Amino acid sequence: MTPVELAKYLDHTLLAPEATSRDIAKLCQEANEMNVAAICCSPSFLPLAQGLLSSQIAVACVIGFPSGAHASEVKSFESATAVKNGATEIDMVVNLGLVYSAMWLELGDEILAVRKSVGTLTKLKVIIESAALTDEQIIMACRVAVTNGADFVKTSTGFHKS
């Protein structure tokens, strides 16, 4: 696989809390040059990113970031608002407390609520922080995510201490 072919599978991401509009503009310029699958940014920069990207590049937004401990209603509202502001993909961080507590029904309800808030045309990626989980927790979190509407499962935010 060539670098150009590989780029079509990558998300170019900038989620640092101190990221500036100039940083996001640079992210989008690089994404356009590399022709990546998507960029991922925080909700506050969605309109800027949307205006700077080629139409072939998806715009992903993090939800419940970075801890995943937000209330389900907040995640649903944040997701719907992100789509309204130009996101075509949602990267939702799971509530690790639900995973550690084996509260699989509640986790499923949360994922399903976000799925319903964004509809079926928006890609939903669920971030599980796999380095912080046992193999059994990873398997269950993945099953719950896919069963409740996730299009992808991602391993990490890159912000968890593990």
Language-model segments: which ranges?
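Alpha/beta enzyme core
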Residues: 1-34, 38, 44-162
